[in-house]
Amino acid sequence: MDLSIFITVQGMERLQKRINELMAERPEVIKAVAVAREFGDLSENAEYKAAKERQRAIDSEIDYLRRRAAQLKV
């Protein structure tokens, strides 16, 4: 049984736009992680923890959107 999920062209364009936005933001977040890492002790480094959390969130959303896009039919 085919359980295809359909999406409009505009919907797919919005999905791709969001993926592209996240991919553009990712290098900035990676730089923020590197800068925060230079502050020293990572166990008490709030900037580092926040930057790593943002990086994880971006990576998770990119992964989710890419998997979702692969399942959709326009």
List PLM regions with ranges.
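Structured alpha/beta interaction-core segments
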Residues: 68-74
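Helix-rich terminal scaffold detector
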Residues: 1-63
